[in-house]
Amino acid sequence: MAEAEEVKTMKILVTGFEPFGGETRNPSAEVVEHLPDTIAGAEIVKLILPTVRYEAPQRVAEALERYRPDVVLSIGQAGGRTAVSVERVAVNLDDYRIPDNAGNQPQEEPVVPGGPDAYLTNLPVKAMAEAIRAAGVPAEVSLSAGTFVCNHVLYSVRHYLERHFPGIRNGFLHIPYLPEQVLDKPGQPSMPLELSRRAVEAALTAIAGGNAAMPAGATGG
């Protein structure tokens, strides 16, 4: 009788960001901290990143070397958005409206000089958005991760993976402000922490459930 084939447990590195822009809270960090250690059979490794241009992707690179995950899913705050955004594209552009937490404020500079104009994420973005909506949380597929540290991390991590760990996939979710963050921001939308956490768990379940990924690849030159 043949020996049973060993089933490898999927490992997903999930990252959030520290508060920035004068805020005292960042829902992405709080969601990551509240995630269980296992989701849909996948091991969840949690990491909070500094909201700093080059330091954030360096922390991810260190975690990649240490944990060797199958997937990296980064979470970030996107004030003004009304739904959870599953990002499809990372662009090779740093153009910061405000300084990061180290005072960096690049204008019209590349994330990686000489890198591709953009990368399409290789996670199942539509399946992730559908799973989030099925969990009762508004969600959309987004074509812009902005030009701040969130996009910088999405692009930099993918660029690093293409060169060092091409079998590892990565993607990004943007979540709205917390209700407490908009008390002094009339008209700004928000989402309770529990809903954002539910959305992230649903997206991770979709990833761990073996949904087919989009073909890997870059666009532009």
For the regions a language model picked out, list residue spans one by one.
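N-terminal catalytic or cofactor-binding beta/alpha core of small enzyme domains
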Residues: A2-A145, R158-G167, Q188-G221
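Hydrophobic, aromatic-enriched interface-forming segments
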Residues: N151-R158
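An accessory alpha-helical subdomain
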Residues: H174-E180
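Short acidic, glycine/proline-rich loop/turn micro-motifs
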Residues: L183-P186
